[in-house]
Amino acid sequence: MSSRSKRQSHGSTRGKRESESRGSSGRIKKERDREKEPEAASSRGSPVRVKREAEPAAREVPAPALPVVRVKREREADEDSEPEREVRAKNGRVDSEDRRSRHCPYLDTINRSVLDFDFEKLCSISLSHINAYACLVCGKYFQGRGLKSHAYIHSVQFSHHVFLNLHTLKFYCLPDNYEIIDSSLEDITYVLKPTFTKQQIANLDKQAKLSRAYDGTTYLPGIVGLNNIKANDYANAVLQALSNVPPLRNYFLEEDNYKNIKRPPGDIMFLLVQRFGELMRKLWNPRNFKAHVSPHEMLQAVVLCSKKTFQITKQGDGVDFLSWFLNALHSALGGTKKKKKTIVNDVFQGSMRIFTKKLPHPDLPAEEKEQLLHNDEYQETMVESTFMYLTLDLPTAPLYKDEKEQLIIPQVPLFNILAKFNGITEKEYKTYKENFLKRFQLTKLPPYLIFCIKRFTKNNFFVEKNPTIVNFPITNVDLREYLSEEVQAVHKNTTYDLIANIVHDGKPSEGSYRIHVLHHGTGKWYELQDLQVTDILPQMITLSEAYIQIWKRRDNDETNQQGA
């Protein structure tokens, strides 16, 4: 064979090898492209297909990361920043947990008879307020719902699976840790946080229908007993009285009226407003599980905000508590003494003129007294002042007993003790060094007028109670004659009707409080003493030792519905 033919055969052989190498490299490139396609698909949200098409060794790579992710997710679940079903929807995963949310098998284990949301929302084990959950099987409060949380451990140990977040009002199943979505649970959230529409609030005083609690007892919304924890009946009576003042009640039934009020950081006084609003909504809730309410959270706020001046375990004075509470509410709502007004001012605040005259010392000679009376210091002065309530002074009780060795209980008409404010009657007030004569005259009558009958006097040794009975009509008390002449023409409506009467029974330090309230829808009177609620005749109210009274000013278009 010639050298030329050898070169041709060698060239053809090398060409075949090059073509084969190019073909093999093309096949390798195509295979690499096919391997890259599932990786790109995995980034678009199909991780399952990637694991099946990849090599068996790749299937075992993410396995150790799964429990870590699950633990992290369950720990983050305690924060309740976003429902888990929304997170799954964003990630494109709609799994069986959504179906479990709509068909939880443990809803029949809920025991509504043990649910009580009147107490402070804190964990029964850690005493923490953060992420508090209520077990709907036993009614206890626990913290968290992640792994090793108290709620999680409780669900595993006792097989209690349904929990309610007391802050977000969402239901969860533990230990499976998925949210429960069911319309049959709406009555539980309504008991925890009742809400009222403007139409419902407007119709409260027109309804005379009894509501039925879950335990079968019937009650009138607003005429509900308050639990006496130990010695808080003085506060219960005042809170019951204020809850039956329609403008004040309507304001606090609608949380939007006060929830956006700006307060300084760390201000604890606004807690009083929040707790009072919650108590009002519970007292007027027509769908309560029980026919009574515990004021525990409200009283905890009172103890905190009053710096333990008023306590749950120690008897207090109703007038002192009423005075402090109204002023604290006014201040917490952003009110000031002169300029900024609140709902408390609009409802209860009136005004009067106070005339004051200084008296010479009684031990001075008569001639020196006459000379001092001509000085400017001893001339009568007048100041304008506002008031939240009027203090009515009782005549001194007799010291002697009758022929049957019983103390004489005197009686006095209401108009006799109201004469203090006619602008003519003078009363002497003594201080440590000086004596004054004062007289009072009303210049403005509020829509709701509070009378505080002064029954207790303190001396250096003990507190003495005046048992004098005040005779008063239930309706048609006209106060026009106690206004100054120039104000009488401006005040068209000066007639008042009684709506609440607080009574103190027993000794000053060992007595108890009860209250008579008028239900506007039925026009009937009811007596409330802690958890006891009974109806009472209007004629029986005047026989009691009245201590605090709330009177409603009658409008021109208003008719008398009390029938007394």
Curated annotation (Swiss-Prot):
Binding positions (Zn(2+)): C135, C138, H154, H160
UniProt catalytic activity: Thiol-dependent hydrolysis of ester, thioester, amide, peptide and isopeptide bonds formed by the C-terminal Gly of ubiquitin (a 76-residue protein attached to proteins as an intracellular targeting signal)
Family membership noted in the UniProt record: Belongs to the peptidase C19 family.
Sequence positions bearing Phosphoserine: S46, S81
Entry-linked InterPro entries: Papain-like_cys_pep_sf, Peptidase_C19_UCH, Ub_carboxyl-term_hydrolase, USP39, USP_dom, Znf_RING/FYVE/PHD, Znf_UBP
Recorded name of the encoding gene: Usp39
Crosslink site: Glycyl lysine isopeptide (Lys-Gly) (interchain with G-Cter in SUMO2): K51
Disruption phenotype: USP39-deficient embryos display early embryonic lethality due to a failure in primitive streak formation and apico-basal polarity in epiblast cells. In addition, USP39-deficient mice are more sensitive to LPS stimulation and bacterial infection.
GO cellular component: nucleoplasm; nucleus; spliceosomal complex; U4/U6 x U5 tri-snRNP complex
Chief site of localization: nucleus
Gene Ontology BP, a term: mRNA splicing, via spliceosome
UniProt feature, compositional bias: Basic and acidic residues: 28-39, 84-96
Biological role stated in the UniProt entry: Deubiquitinating enzyme that plays a role in many cellular processes including cellular antiviral response, epithelial morphogenesis, DNA repair or B-cell development. Plays a role in pre-mRNA splicing as a component of the U4/U6-U5 tri-snRNP, one of the building blocks of the precatalytic spliceosome. Specifically regulates immunoglobulin gene rearrangement in a spliceosome-dependent manner, which involves modulating chromatin interactions at the Igh locus and therefore plays an essential role in B-cell development.
Molecular function GO labels: cysteine-type deubiquitinase activity; zinc ion binding
EC main group: hydrolase
EC id: 3.4.19.12
Protein name: Ubiquitin carboxyl-terminal hydrolase 39
Domain of life assignment: Eukaryota
Keyword Nuclease: no
UniProt KW keywords: Cell cycle, Cell division, Hydrolase, Isopeptide bond, Metal-binding, mRNA processing, mRNA splicing, Nucleus, Phosphoprotein, Spliceosome, Ubl conjugation, Ubl conjugation pathway, Zinc, Zinc-finger
PANTHER family: U4_U6.U5 TRI-SNRNP-ASSOCIATED PROTEIN 2, UBIQUITIN CARBOXYL-TERMINAL HYDROLASE
